[in-house]
Amino acid sequence: MADRRNLFFFYGDDKATLVEKMKPIYRILEENGFTILDHPKNANAIVSVGDDATFLQAVRKTGFREDCLYAGISTKDEISFYCDFHIDHVDTALQEITKNEIEVRKYPTIQVDVDGSTSFHCLNEFSLRSSIIKTFVVDVHVDDLYFETFRGDGLVVSTPTGSTAYNKSLHGAVVDPLIPCFQVSELASLNNNTYRTLGSPFILNHERTLTLKLRPDGNDYPVIGMDNEALSIKQVEKAVVRLSDKQIKTVKLKNNSFWEKVQRTFL
């Protein structure tokens, strides 16, 4: 990151307070040859200030750029999965950057195409959920294979890094982000003689394509989740999900691996 000198800082809630707190850090950065930009267009490093939710927003609002690095500064009690640095210790982080104590990790994303007209990426997960208090029916296809018919509250498709989020609360597996794959988990599936699903999360490799076809039973206006944002689409017939070639390059400390974060967070 030492050669990435044009920085854009992305803030979530309470921006005014955080900007004021960051001013001394801005001075330190500028004294060390960094330029603070007001717009991400010409940035080659984008830094989120907040928490993991802020980091997800920073990536989405700046277009999942592959030509720059993303870094996260936590304002909470601890560093988190996407935030390797803390707002109270950024001066220490700068020393680690200049001493080459950091490394760049590439995280996979998933691409979702809805009805051939709307396309977007997700860093954590894509979710398809019933928008009313009623189950909906989805035919699940893996590549060209009709796999199962799901009836329930929804489906969640997560990346390896997203496997520790919504997916984990659905008893999905925590997946090493070095494995190029994506995972499908169920939300309250209904299993009987008419509808039968695998009943457990399943993992698809990077060459697979997942197709979700909604049956028109009066509940084909689902809520579509893109990480921590909702997408409003009047009617959905089909969603096609695959692992994207687009990867997000993040800055992490060498002594703070994915599994160390998992251990610190859950054990």
Curated annotation (Swiss-Prot):
GO process terms (BP): NAD metabolic process; NADP biosynthetic process
Enzyme Commission number(s): 2.7.1.23
Enzyme class: transferase
GO molecular function: ATP binding; metal ion binding; NAD binding; NAD+ kinase activity
Keywords noted in UniProt: ATP-binding, Cytoplasm, Kinase, NAD, NADP, Nucleotide-binding, Transferase
InterPro entries recorded: ATP-NAD_kinase_N, ATP-NAD_kinase_PpnK-typ_C, NAD/diacylglycerol_kinase_sf, NADK
Cofactor(s) in the UniProt record: a divalent metal cation
Active-site annotation: D52
Matching Pfam families: NAD_kinase_C (PF20143)
Protein localization: Cytoplasm
Domain of life of the source: Bacteria
Catalytic activity: NAD(+) + ATP = ADP + NADP(+) + H(+)
Annotated binding of NAD(+), by residue: D52, A53, N124, E125, R151, D153, T164, A165, Y166, N167, K168, S169, A188
Entry GO terms, CC: cytoplasm
Keyword presence, Kinase: yes
HAMAP family: NAD_kinase
Family membership noted in the UniProt record: Belongs to the NAD kinase family.
Function recorded in the entry: Involved in the regulation of the intracellular balance of NAD and NADP, and is a key enzyme in the biosynthesis of NADP. Catalyzes specifically the phosphorylation on 2'-hydroxyl of the adenosine moiety of NAD to yield NADP.
Protein's name according to its UniProt entry: NAD kinase 2
Organism annotation: Bacillus cereus (strain ATCC 14579 / DSM 31 / CCUG 7414 / JCM 2152 / NBRC 15305 / NCIMB 9373 / NCTC 2599 / NRRL B-3711)
Organism taxonomic ancestry: Bacteria, Bacillati, Bacillota, Bacilli, Bacillales
Gene that this sequence comes from: nadK2
